[in-house]
UniProtKB/Swiss-Prot annotation:
UniProt protein name: ATP-dependent DNA helicase CHL1
Organism (species): Coccidioides immitis (strain RS)
Catalytic activity entry: Couples ATP hydrolysis with the unwinding of duplex DNA at the replication fork by translocating in the 5'-3' direction. This creates two antiparallel DNA single strands (ssDNA). The leading ssDNA polymer is the template for DNA polymerase III holoenzyme which synthesizes a continuous strand; ATP + H2O = ADP + phosphate + H(+)
GO cellular component annotations of the record: nucleus
Record SUPFAM superfamilies: P-loop containing nucleoside triphosphate hydrolases
Length: 861
């Protein structure tokens, strides 16, 4: 399969960089590589990912089909018999595929009629939803919260299944397995092990946008047509037999969490994901009587509805909301029923957490073996993996959890027998020990945060006699947290008559998550405390995500990371994929689709008052520098039309700057810098405390620009406006980045991260002692700088969002003039970067925007 000759079936005329992207992507997948792709926003990255990967997939399926036909049994038979056998096999496969496509085509026509007539199956839907309400109202019996008898102390065996299916009844599990791989379904659909693409991104809105792009593309079928002579037309050159041509729309399913996909109103209203998960599992437990189970869950009675759900999902490309509506129409839980679709899909879209967390993959019966993984918006992938496997618990939560356990133990004292009584007492003892340690930390005034030795948490009386491995299994198998929370919730609602939703995480679930991390520590995990007023937060933090991602990488055929700003890429090579053999990892950085004349990028090391801009932590409080900053921004705003967005390194520094700008410049009654800025452009700024939400702030900003006044928006790197917000065209003619948002290197957490990187680098390095230490120190410094520069690059990427866009990007700090920092900027920025004095920079801005304005006027004429 030669990617250089491919058209990739792009719905438009692709840019050269898109063609390069698609070819490199195709090659990476074909050669089973790990690829990192950087392509700026506005360059059509999503369509490049779709066209490159699905072109490869259809080619691969076509090759498998042809190989399967050629490798027919009976090679010792006469050639005419072999030819007949191959032709017959082609006919059977083609007819099977045609039956599928015809059925899905009928569904598409039905859906079109449904939309036109606006007909919905409201009575059926209401009946199903009302059934769900009635069944849920029967869950308040005290007996539902009693612990099952527990005696699974054998460490070698356990009844616990790591998958969430462990709580389902045997009939439900059997049905799910049947629906995902029955002979009848496999006769018509792709087999379970057919290669597919798993595409994930940060949010469901991004996945919905991806689905919209997916609808634009049409690919040739995976089964090639035959010529009139009965030969397979692999080149597309012969006269085709019309009966052998197939239409094969892309098969897609979008997956989500229970919180996203649940259609049971009384479960959905719980609000919190953990509470929804636990209530859902409660209603599917094998111990629940049939009449009390969730009516939307798969069962023998609604098997036909599940098949109907599957066909409707596969008939067209749907986003997660569409799939929820299909579930409501068919009366089937989309979360569970989607499993019957995964095996028959070509591309599966899902949010980060469902792909990156093994327990989530197990819950959905997702196997990554020999499939293709594409992770979009992957610039923060290492942080995302670390956050998924990190957990916090506060002293307040521990106290509440201990109180709830005490109430529960008293209520069920007579019924708690044997191992249940022993283990509940052990959990209470462990919580008490951890709480006691945190109380001592709170009482000590000298430190606000620091590292925690795990042994300090286990210093309570009798803790050394607890077998943490057994207790960990007990917490998972007994469902203690669920039982206790259910009882507490039931008691509270009965007394206070307050059945409204609660969006907070149930305390004992949070406590249990922390305890499980504590009992099963990763070699890459560390414990920290952080004081917050009269409370203390205890944090289990994963320092290195490599091991948690490695299993997925080694299972998959190929792994693709893509993003608009993946630079600097050295962290992926040196840390996330450090175990890969040379040549197994490939990196690609593509330029922008805009001409270089549409970008003015300048480092600004001095202001118009000739103050050096040095926004390091030690020097950024200089009043003179902050005043010069304001005056310089004012001059830049005069030269820049429409919207200007300025990013500060932190909320604290932004607030400090604004306070100084509010003060009069002298005693002569001159206006403040803030007033002066307001005369040039209306001024808005992001604040943690401000009541105005992000949408309202952006709308106000856009309104000023639409009115022709322009606007200056002060925001924060790493804040709400620095990621996922498009400041295209007039919204972002100027982007100013002020300083470098380095994390607090003195914090215990960052000290631990850097020490970990240095130690791993030292262990991997060769050479003498001094050389190894030098490499380790350099690696730690790089890791620290790269974390900062990823945030900077995200801010820079907010502007210039399409081919005809243009903007000026100015980076205020002397460090932006150094080769080391510039090397960590995206390539398309580096190519346009010019250093000049501030006077020349401002003069260039006037010229730059005057030229752009004259071009726009000419176009309008």
């Amino acid at each position: 399969m030669n990617p250089s000759s491919k058209t990739f079936y792009h719905p438009y005329s692709p840019y050269d960089i898109q063609v390069q992207f698609m070819r490199s992507l195709y090659t990476c997948i074909e050669e089973c590589k790990v690829g990192i792709f950087e392509s700026p926003t506005g360059t059509g990255k999503s369509l490049s990912l779709i066209c490159g990967s699905l072109t490869w997939l259809r080619d691969h399926k076509r090759s498998v089909f042809l190989e399967d036909i050629e490798n027919s049994d009976g090679d010792d038979e006469p050639e005419w018999i072999l030819q007949y056998s191959r032709k017959e096999k082609r006919r059977i496969i083609r007819e099977r595929r045609k039956r599928v496509e015809d059925r899905l085509s009928r569904i598409r026509k039905e859906e079109l009629l449904r939309e036109k007539a606006a007909i919905a199956n409201i009575p059926f839907k209401k009946q199903r939803l009302e059934d769900g309400k009635r069944h849920l109202d029967k869950m308040a019996d005290d007996g539902a919260f009693e612990l099952d008898e527990y005696d699974s102390d054998n460490q070698e065996t356990s009844t616990h299944d790591a998958k969430s299916n462990s709580d389902l009844s045997a009939t439900t599990i059997a049905l799910l397995e049947k629906l995902s791989g029955s002979a009848e379904i496999q006769d018509d659909f792709e087999e379970e092990n057919a290669v597919k693409i798993f595409y994930c991104s940060r949010t469901h809105s991004q996945l919905a946008q991806f689905a919209r792009e997916l609808r634009r593309v049409v690919f040739p079928p995976s089964i090639p047509p035959e010529t009139e002579d009965g030969e397979i037309d692999t080149q597309g050159e012969g006269r085709r037999h019309p009966d052998t041509e197939l239409e094969e729309p892309t098969k897609h399913v979008s997956l989500g969490s229970r919180k996203t996909m649940c259609i049971n109103p009384k479960v959905r209203r719980l609000g919190n994901a953990t509470a929804i998960n636990e209530r859902c599992l409660d209603l599917q437990s094998s111990n629940v009587l049939p009449g009390h189970k969730c009516p939307f869950a798969p069962s023998k009675e609604n098997e036909l509805a599940i098949n109907d759900f599957r066909d409707h999902v596969l008939a067209e490309v749907h986003d997660i909301e569409d799939i929820g509506k299909i579930g409501q129409r068919t009366g089937i839980c989309p979360y569970y029923a989607s499993r019957s679709v995964i095996g028959h899909s070509e591309i599966v879209t899902l949010p980060y957490q469902l792909l990156l967390q093994k327990s989530a993959r197990d819950a959905l019966d997702i196997s990554l073996k020999d499939h293709v993984i594409i992770i979009d918006e992957a610039h923060n992938l290492m942080d995302v993996i670390a956050n998924i496997h990190s957990v916090n618990v506060s002293l307040t939560q521990l106290r509440i959890g201990l109180e709830q356990l005490t109430i529960y133990a008293r209520k069920y004292k007579a019924r708690l027998k044997g191992k249940n009584r022993v283990y509940v007492a052990q959990v209470m003892r462990l919580l008490g020990s951890i709480a006691k340690y945190l109380e001592s930390v709170l009482a000590a005034r000298e430190l606000r945060e620091g590292a925690v030795d795990p042994s300090y948490l286990m210093s309570g009386k009798g803790i050394d006699q607890i077998n943490l491995h057994k207790l960990s299994r007990y917490l998972q198998e007994s469902k203690l947290a669920r039982k206790v929370d259910g009882y507490i919730e039931s008691s509270t609602s009965l007394e206070e008559k307050n059945p409204e939703t609660s969006t907070t995480v149930p305390v004992l679930f949070q406590v249990q998550s922390f305890l499980l991390s504590l009992m099963n520590p990763s070699a890459e995990g560390r414990l920290f405390f952080e004081k917050n007023g009269n409370d203390v937060l205890l944090k289990y933090t994963l320092l290195d995500p490599t091991a948690h991602f490695r299993e997925a990488v080694e299972e998959a055929r190929a792994v693709i990371l893509a993003g608009g700003t993946m630079s600097p890429m050295s962290d992926y090579r040196d840390h996330l994929f450090s175990y890969l053999a040379p040549g197994q990892l490939r990196t690609f950085s593509y330029g922008h689709v805009i001409p270089t004349s549409n970008l003015s990028a300048r480092p600004v090391s001095r202001g118009i008052l000739d103050t050096e801009f040095d926004f390091t932590f030690e020097k950024r409080n200089s009043r003179a520098m902050i005043i010069d900053l304001g005056k310089t921004i004012s001059e830049i705003c005069k030269a820049t039309p429409d919207g200007v967005v300025a990013f500060f390194p932190s909320y604290d520094f932004l607030n400090q700057v604004v306070e100084i700008w509010k003060q009069p410049c002298s005693n002569s009654g001159n206006p403040s810098i803030l007033d002066s800025l307001g005369l040039v452009k209306p001024l808005l700024y992001e604040s943690k405390e401000k009541a105005m939400n992000t949408e309202a702030l952006l709308q106000k900003y856009a309104n000023f620009i639409d009115e022709g006044k322009g606007a200056l928006l002060l925001s924060v790197m790493g804040g709400k406006l620095s990621e996922g917000i498009n400041f295209s065209d007039r919204l972002g003619r100027g982007v100013i980045v002020i300083g470098l948002p380095f994390a607090n290197i003195r914090s215990a957490e960052w000290q631990a991260k850097i020490q970990y990187v240095e130690r791993k680098t030292y262990e991997r390095s060769s050479g003498g002692e001094e050389t190894r230490r030098s490499k380790a120190k350099l690696a730690g410094r790089d890791f620290y700088e790269n974390a900062c520069m990823r945030v900077v690059n995200q801010c820079i990427g907010r502007a210039i969002r399409h081919q005809h866009d243009y903007a000026a990007i100015l980076m205020f700090d002397r460090r932006y003039g150094t080769a080391r920092i510039q090397s960590k900027l995206p390539e398309w920025i580096r190519r346009s970067l010019i250093s000049a004095p501030i006077g020349a920079t401002i003069s260039n801005l006037y010229t730059f925007f005057e030229e752009k304005s004259s071009i726009e006027v000419t176009k309008e004429k």
